[in-house]
C-alpha cells in the first residue's frame, strides 16, 4: 500500500486490490475469501490506509496530485497562495511538518475512537442485506449523480452493477475490470504521448531501459500471479494419476 500510494493516478485504488490479491494467493484457504476471511478485510484496509498517507509524497515533493482528492488539496493550497512542490518544505516548514504530524495524530485518534465502538460496528454487520443493499444503491446513485448532475451517470452505474453481478455469478473477478476502467484513460493518454514523442516508433518501449525494466517487472508480476493456479492444476493432475 505504501509503495503503490506514491504512484500518481490509480495508486490508491491499486493498493487495496493488490493487497487483496496477495493475501488470497498467500492464504492456505483461498476459498474463504469473499465469505468474510479476516485477511481479505484487514489486508486491503491496511493497504488503503497506507496509500492514503504516502499519496502526499508526490504532492509535497513534486507538486503532482496522486488522485482527485489530492487535486482538491492542491486547489486549496493555491487559494492560500502556496505552490505545492519541493519549495514547500523550505518555504513552509510549519505546513509540511504539520501535515506529517496530522497523520500520526489522526491514526492515534482513530484507534482511541474506534476501540470503544467495536461493539457498535459489529452490530452494524448484523443489518440484513435486504435493508442494507437498497440503502447502498440509493446512496451510490446520489453520489454518482451529484458529481456531474447527469442522469447518464446513474444509468452507467446501474449497468456496471449488473455487469459486476454477472461476473461474480460466472466466477470472474470484477476487480481487474474495475482497474481497467480506472487506469484505462491514463494508459491511453500516456501511450498516445509516448507514441508522439517517439514519432510512432513502438520499439521505444523495449529499447528504453526504464520502459523495458517496467515491462519486465510487469511480466514477472503476471507470472507470479499465475503460478498458484498452475501449481494447483498440476497437483490435481498428479492426484488423478495416482
From Swiss-Prot:
Keyword annotations from UniProtKB, A to Z: Plasmid
Organism whose genome encodes this protein: Agrobacterium vitis
Protein name according to UniProt: Uncharacterized protein in TAR-II ttuC' 3'region
InterPro entries reported in the protein's UniProt record: DUF112_TM
Amino acid at each position: 500500500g505504501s509503495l503503490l500510494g506514491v504512484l500518481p493516478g490509480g495508486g490508491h485504488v491499486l493498493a487495496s486490490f493488490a493487497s487483496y490479491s496477495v493475501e488470497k494467493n498467500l492464504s492456505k484457504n483461498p476459498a474463504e475469501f469473499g465469505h468474510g476471511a479476516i485477511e481479505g478485510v484487514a489486508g486491503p484496509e491496511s493497504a488503503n490506509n497506507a496509500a492514503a498517507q504516502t499519496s502526499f509524497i508526490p504532492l509535497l515533493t513534486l507538486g503532482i496530485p496522486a488522485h482527485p482528492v489530492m487535486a482538491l488539496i492542491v486547489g486549496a493550497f493555491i487559494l492560500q497562495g502556496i505552490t505545492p512542490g519541493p519549495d514547500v518544505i523550505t518555504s513552509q516548514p510549519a505546513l509540511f511538518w504539520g501535515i506529517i504530524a496530522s497523520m500520526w495524530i489522526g491514526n492515534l485518534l482513530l484507534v482511541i475512537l474506534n476501540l470503544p465502538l467495536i461493539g457498535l460496528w459489529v452490530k452494524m454487520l448484523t443489518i440484513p442485506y435486504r435493508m442494507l443493499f437498497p440503502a447502498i444503491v440509493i446512496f451510490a446513485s446520489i453520489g454518482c449523480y451529484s458529481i456531474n448532475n447527469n442522469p447518464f451517470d446513474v444509468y452507467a452505474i446501474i449497468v456496471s452493477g449488473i455487469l459486476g453481478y454477472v461476473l461474480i455469478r460466472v466466477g470472474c473477478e470484477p476487480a481487474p475490470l474495475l482497474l481497467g476502467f480506472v487506469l484505462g484513460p491514463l494508459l491511453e493518454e500516456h501511450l498516445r504521448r509516448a507514441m508522439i514523442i517517439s514519432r510512432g516508433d513502438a520499439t521505444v518501449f523495449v529499447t528504453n531501459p526504464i520502459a523495458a525494466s517496467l515491462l519486465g517487472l510487469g511480466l514477472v508480476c503476471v507470472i507470479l500471479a499465475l503460478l498458484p493456479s498452475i501449481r494447483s492444476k498440476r497437483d490435481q493432475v498428479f492426484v488423478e494419476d495416482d
